[in-house]
Amino acid sequence: AMMPATGGQYVFMEKMYGRFWAYLYGWANFAVINTAAGAGITFICAQYLEYFFKLPRFSPEIEQSVMLHLPFVGDILPLENFGVKMLTVFLLFISTYVAYRSTKLGGVVQVVFTVAKVLAIGLLIGGLFASGKGDYSNFITEDATIKPAGFALLIAMVAACNGALQALDGAYQIVYMAGEVKNPGKSLPRSLILGLLVCMIIYMLVTASMVYMLPVHDMASSKLVASDAAKAAFGIIGGGIIALLICLSVLGATNALVLCAPRITFAMAEERAFPAWAGKMHPKFKTPGNALVLHFIWMSILVISGSFIILADMYIFIVWTFNLMIIYGLFILRKKMPDAERPYKVWGYPWMPLLALFFNAFYLVMVLYRDISDYISGKTHIMNSVFGLVLTALGIPLYWYFKTRQTKQA
């Protein structure tokens, strides 16, 4: 509300910390945030399609035979779950092709996917509870095999936050279009609060409906929780319908990211902060074609290099790393711009921002600790959060390269 300019957090970072950190945030959007998010959610779609047909997979020996070691990060297994990865790349190609050919067509497709999303959520929440085939005791019954205690319980709770934070991420996307919103001083805070509340309520209701149908142990061991819950309520056909609707719903999120995310890269290229090639508009289709292709190539590389868990974890970690900086930036702006008009003031300042700052920092430290300890103990072959940090840090030499280049051309 204080800075109603198109660009959202990119603009905030520049005002708070300067050009370097704004550039690094823009780079992170390309290297991790938007691309890992797009690759990760499309991975889910490919996995749910396995409800209908089994995708080919190499033997464990072959999957382990090709391993790329990244110093200080871990090992990448490109052949692991290869069938799902190839289908994921194909789905990303289709979404990119549609966006490349026509922005309008991409918007029409988005409407179809949105309808599927509403149907999927409605059937899951209403249908599962209405079936009467679940058990409310699932909400209070302990599982004999899942009993973390002490510090392990704390780690488990932090790990469980990843899914919730990913589901809620995006509720603030309206800030990217703040410069196009009428009366942003009132409209933005209202839409942000309402959007976050709606997302929280839907997330809790969907989760509750699945807990009602499946005991905790069954949920923990399921690869397709929503379909398994629907299958228990409505049979194989019901599970298939939910799987299909989830695929369409997830493709809607993919389509939105493929449509919008490359435009940040396109804008950075126009500002000569990215290769000029990425800032060229397609002469016929009038779309940021080169930026779209660049994003598709990088998303495909991320898909081959990881799994849904790897992509989701590193994406959420980097998002909340920058969120930490933005929360702290509230205090910076109070000092740098004390007389600026503030249509909306943070409730409970400074205690509420401090509480958010503490939770954010605690979450990041615990995730980093979990990733490193799991890697050292051999539970995982890669440190997801460190992987995201390394990819983000690659933007540092690029910043100085483009800055030096701009200085020479000036």
Residue ranges of each PLM-predicted region?
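Hydrophobic transmembrane alpha-helices that form the core helical bundles
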Residues: 1-92, 97-100, 247-267, 307-321
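TM-loop-TM module centered on a large, flexible mid-protein loop between adjacent transmembrane helices
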Residues: 11-12, 18, 50-67, 141-149, ...
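Alpha-helical transmembrane segments of multipass membrane proteins
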Residues: 27-30, 96-97, 125, 207-209, ...
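Transmembrane helix-loop boundary segments of multi-pass membrane transporters
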Residues: 40-48, 53-61, 67-81, 104-113, ...
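Hydrophobic alpha-helical segments and their helix-loop junctions in multi-pass secondary transporters
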Residues: 47-57, 115-144, 167, 208-214, ...
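Membrane-interface loop-to-helix entry segments
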Residues: 83-134, 192, 315-325, 350-355, ...
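Junctions where cytoplasmic loops transition into the N-terminal start of transmembrane alpha-helices
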Residues: 112-116, 175-211, 264
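C-terminal membrane-solvent junction of multi-pass transporters and transport-like membrane proteins
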Residues: 277-287, 323-386
